[in-house]
A protein has these predicted regions:
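Proline-aspartate-enriched helix->loop->beta-strand connector
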Residues: 117, 124-130, 147, 257-260, ...
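Basic- and aromatic-lined ligand-binding clefts that recognize polyanionic substrates
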Residues: 70-83, 179-239
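Bacterial N-terminal signal peptides that target proteins for export
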Residues: 1-9
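Bacterial Sec-exported substrate-binding components of ABC uptake systems
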Residues: 20-73, 176-206, 274-280, 326-332
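A short, structured surface patch at a secondary-structure boundary
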Residues: 69-123, 127
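Extracytoplasmic substrate-binding proteins
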Residues: 138-213, 311-332
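Structured C-terminal subdomain patch of bacterial secreted/periplasmic proteins
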Residues: 46, 264-332
């Protein structure tokens, strides 16, 4: 089940802990960098029916109305909405907080494990979009309701994801604009990092789960790992590399207070798991190992919210990059 990791994140027993005032980093309280704004695209397709046949990612031929607005999307809602489309309903786990304009008139499915056929049917869709790793047996169930097209889900290649969506709906102009935005965002972010003097530095993202730990990055988990290490080309120190590559240990394995210093990077960020609180909890601040870190003594720990980084979709990219740079600026 490809949404399991995402669901685990939201179902984790997060302890809401009181904390003192802390230097935090959200997109609302730090200096804005010269990063591009997310373009607002509209759906300019005709209302006339336009039948089209394509071969899907799983090799099936599907005939559908390429101009339909009657769509139910079981995955990748952020990419779909970014393109200018407004489905009837989308995956209920999609993050809409702060993106209400995109979700106006769009309902969220209540049943997402992986779906309730009756609920999907209730929307009377002409087309169903789903993630490309859905089991064929589930796709077969959906095909009894409407044509089904799997779309790219489990990849950071936004060009592949967005161009494929643009091809499905003949919205190449919109997909080209969106891809250009993503390219510009990456390029300007790299340039901004160099201006801050952090090129080739090491970065460590700490969090708390039954102990101070480092969030996993296997199977593309958490977008901040991709941005920091793959796009911005920052590095992990040797101990962080060993920790993240150790598949034998459980995710979020606690790091002992005595060894925590060994994981400190040139840049250090704390990933808050509390959706409503971007501060470092007391259970972390009172940890002797944490208090011994140079970055903590110098009050140079940036904070991000881990929930923002649970989805790869283009809709969230601008805020994800801004949040990371706000956190990095705290460490200056």
């Amino acid at each position: 089940m490809n949404f399991i990791f995402k669901k685990v994140l939201f179902l984790l027993p997060i302890i809401i802990l009181s904390s003192c005032n802390e230097v935090t980093s959200t997109s609302n309280n730090s200096t804005k960098l010269d990063l591009p704004k997310m373009p607002t695209l509209v759906d300019n397709r005709s209302n006339d029916k336009k039948m089209k046949t394509i071969t899907t990612l799983n090799g099936n031929e599907v005939t559908y109305n390429a101009n339909t607005r009657d769509i139910v999307a079981l995955g990748c809602a952020g990419d779909i909405l970014s393109l200018g489309l407004r489905p009837l309903a989308v995956d209920g786990n999609t993050n809409s907080n702060g993106y209400e304009n995109y979700f106006y008139g769009v309902e969220k499915l209540k049943n997402t494990q992986p779906f309730d056929p009756e609920e999907v049917l209730s929307y009377k869709p002409e087309l169903i979009l789903t993630y490309d790793t859905m089991d064929q047996k589930d796709i077969t169930k959906l095909e009894k309701i409407a044509p089904v097209i799997p779309i790219y889900f489990n990849t950071y290649d936004y060009e592949k994801r967005i161009s494929y969506l643009g091809n499905i709906f003949d919205m190449k102009d919109n997909s080209d604009i969106l891809i250009s935005f993503c390219h510009e965002l990456e390029e300007k972010s790299l340039a901004s990092l160099e201006k801050l003097g952090f090129k080739n530095k090491t970065v460590t993202v700490f969090s708390y789960m039954n102990g101070i730990c480092i969030p996993p990055d296997f199977n593309g988990a958490f977008v901040f790992n991709h941005i920091l290490y793959d796009v911005l080309n920052l590095n992990k120190n040797e101990k962080v590399e060993q920790y993240l590559n150790n598949q034998a240990q459980p995710a979020y394995s606690p790091i002992s207070s005595e060894k925590l210093k060994e994981y400190e990077g040139d840049i250090n960020i704390y990933a808050s798991m509390d959706e409503t609180d971007n501060s470092i909890p007391d259970v972390v601040k009172t940890n002797e190992g944490w208090k011994s870190l140079k970055c903590v003594k110098g009050n140079k720990v940036g904070v991000i919210n881990i929930v923002l980084f649970s989805l790869k979709d283009v809709l969230y990219m601008a805020n994800q990059y801004q949040s990371i740079f706000n956190a990095i600026e705290v460490t200056l």
